[in-house]
A protein has these predicted regions:
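Low-complexity, glycine/serine/threonine/alanine-rich intrinsically disordered linker
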Residues: 1-663
Length: 663
């Protein structure tokens, strides 16, 4: 039937819009989930031949190679800050706006190189025509820094011809500038070339060449160009088989010195918790959501990062732990100060004498979860007066716990020595733990962490996720339910018709769930049935992420100093997993989450999103073999994300390209 529909659409000429929709991030779930994982599809997987625009993160890491002050080089490769996976290859182009910025950057860098680079200064200033050797060295040197490979003979010939043609007026500096700018505008400095320059097979697929693979692997795992080991493997012909690719990916994943920010970024984009800071919260309701530039939702996002990283470090049952773990990190600025003070209390005699053994210094680093002191500022987002802390006895003595009860206090004595203040929590931080259901002074944020928290289960009950998926002054059952339906249950929710008024009716005497009963009308329920029963279960949390059993009706006048309230109704329904022992009624979000964590469909749905992130596109039915193998690798490894990643990055979907024709 599907094949017949496709044939009829092709005949009518309306197929192109459908194909375009299937390629968009919002419509990946239109590809049938059951068919993808049934095993009935035997087509050899591949990705379409493509150019994938350079990532803004990669550009930030390599722009220092271009010449000039990296701070003056503008970011050309902006990506829409949308929820979900952002970088799809087919949606990113070097349009006129991108090219304009690239040209400005190229001109600036060329000018800087001519002013400061001796080889370029010599060519620009000499009266006689530069030799071919001079031009080849100049072009090759800049080319390698920009494109990360040696230019071919043909490329060198073209650049020298460009210089020669531009130098007819005898102005060598301008001709050199044109040549250097042309190098910076090389397609490989703008796009990742993934057209399949390797060997072809009988099905019309072409394997990525060794060079294409080196860049594809590096940009899949890191935000940097290939390291010397990967480039050497490509140049020596040792990146042509799956086993050779497997060896390089395993090496990079196991090497702790190689930063792998893209792994964390997947979970940020998948869960969307890194959007918490853009949801406005009224200060009168929150009691203050920032202090000295410290935006609490931003700190919650950082806490969530550590929640993710802790699970990834263990690399066991990763998806289940992401959904169910009750171990949370609470890492605001006081975490650092309080832990250092606690360390001081335990080692006071030694520190007061200015003595601290290497063993004790390592103990403090370990408690703070640091490899060295250089990591400190980045990890704990410190106040200016804490930056530069180096673990010496002198600076440890200057750390005191602050417990002002009224306003601020000066915790220094007249001789400017620091007074150590006894146990307690800075009152200005008492608003921060409210989202973790902590009472004032309940605990002091000491490290090491994590802390177990009651009434919580994984990322979907983390304050960062709950705030990110809320509205300005209310929770958001509809969008929370839609997120679960699409991200975890591979479901499709239709767009809101333009004729529908989606405004929630105001009634200050009703709870939000009661007000949303209008969506249960027959005309609305067809779509809302996919979302509301899932989202309602999260009504045990308010829009700040605080656990609750009653909903405060704070728009009504107070009575005897208190707002009216009603009990929370968090009953919901899980439907759509296709698993009889999992689908059914749930009393709240905690029961819902634990049920979903045991679902095959939920696990497979997450794997589909991992695929989209690393392949830069939606899956096709022809990717069935890849997805089934990835699911198998994940299960057989005990839930290892690294094993899943290796399976995907050594799959035919990653290694092979094919030119698609939409007939």
């Amino acid at each position: 039937v599907i094949d017949w529909i496709n044939a009829e659409l092709n005949k009518s000429g309306n197929a192109s819009s459908l194909y375009q929709k299937l390629e968009h991030p919002d419509y990946g779930n239109l590809v049938n989930h059951e068919k993808l994982f049934s095993g009935e599809i035997k087509t050899k997987p591949f990705s379409p031949a493509r150019l994938w625009r350079t990532s803004p993160n990669v550009f930030d890491n390599i722009k220092s190679n271009y010449g000039g002050d990296a701070r003056s080089i503008r970011q050309p490769f902006l990506v829409e800050d949308r929820k979900g996976i952002k970088e799809y290859a087919n949606l990113l182009f070097a349009d006129s706006a991108v090219v304009d910025v690239l040209l400005v950057n190229a001109g600036y860098c060329a000018d800087q190189l001519i002013q400061k680079g001796q080889i370029y200064k010599d060519i620009a200033s000499q009266k006689s025509a530069p030799t071919r050797d001079q031009l080849e060295v100049a072009a090759s040197q800049h080319f390698k820094k920009v494109v990360f490979r040696d230019p071919t003979k043909e490329e060198l010939k073209n650049y020298i011809a460009l210089f020669t043609g531009s130098a007819k007026e005898g102005i060598h500096s301008e001709a050199l500038r044109v040549m250097l700018m042309a190098i910076m505008m090389h397609p490989e400095s703008v796009y990742r070339i993934e057209i399949g320059l390797g060997e072809s097979d009988t099905s019309g697929r072409r394997m990525l060449s060794s060079t294409e693979l080196a860049f594809a692997i590096s940009y899949a795992i890191t935000d940097r160009h290939p390291d010397s080991i990967l480039l050497k493997a490509a140049e020596s012909g040792k990146l042509r088989t799956k086993d050779e690719v497997h060896a390089q990916i395993s090496r990079m994943l196991e090497d702790e010195s190689i930063e792998k920010p893209r792994i964390l970024r997947f979970f940020q984009e998948f869960f969307g918790y890194n959007q918490a800071h853009i949801v406005f919260k009224d200060e009168a309701r929150s009691g203050g959501f920032s202090y000295y530039g410290e935006n609490y939702p931003v700190i919650y996002e950082r806490d969530a990062d550590f929640f993710v990283l802790n699970i990834l470090e263990k690399d066991k049952d990763v998806f289940k732990q992401m959904l169910t773990s009750d171990e949370y990190f609470i890492l605001n600025r006081q975490t650092f100060r309080n832990t250092v003070f606690d360390f001081y209390e335990q080692n006071k005699e030694l520190i007061d004498k200015g003595q601290l053994t290497e063993e004790k210094s390592k103990e403090l680093l370990k408690r703070l979860g640091l490899k060295n002191w250089k990591e400190l500022n980045k990890k704990y987002y410190l106040h200016g007066f804490d930056r530069g802390f180096n673990g010496s006895p002198e600076v440890i003595k200057k750390i005191g716990k602050e417990i002002p009860t009224e306003g601020r206090i000066d915790n220094r004595n007249k001789d400017k020595s620091y007074q150590v203040i006894s146990q307690g929590m800075h009152t200005l931080y008492q608003k921060y733990p409210m989202a973790y259901d902590l009472k004032d002074g309940e605990q002091n944020f000491l490290l090491p962490q994590p802390y177990k928290r009651p009434n919580r289960a994984g990322m979907l009950t983390h304050p960062a996720w709950l705030i990110a998926h809320s509205l300005n002054d209310i929770s958001d059952p509809i969008r929370r339910g839609k997120w679960i339906r699409q991200r975890l249950l591979a479901g499709v929710v239709l767009d809101v018709p333009i004729t529908v008024d989606a405004t929630i009716p105001e009634d200050h005497h009703k709870t939000l769930r009661e007000r949303l009963s209008v969506t249960e009308a027959k005309a609305c329920w067809r779509c809302h049935e996919q979302m509301n029963p899932l989202g309602y279960s999260f009504e045990i949390f308010d829009d700040f992420g605080r656990f609750r059993t009653i909903e405060t009706l704070d728009k009504l006048p107070m009575v005897n100093g208190k707002f009216h309230s009603k009990p929370v109704d968090s009953r919901g329904v899980l439907a759509g997993t296709g698993e009889k022992n999992i689908d059914g009624d749930v009393k709240d979000a905690l029961e819902l989450i634990h049920k979903m964590a045991n679902s095959d469909k939920v696990r497979q749905s997450i794997i589909r999103h991992v695929f989209r992130y690393y392949m830069g596109r939606n899956e096709m039915l022809s990717d069935s073999i890849t997805l089934i193998a990835a699911d198998k690798a994940y299960l057989e490894s005990g839930g290892s994300f690294n094993a899943l990643l290796i399976s995907l990055l050594t799959s035919d979907s990653f290694l092979y390209r094919k030119t698609l024709t939409k007939e």
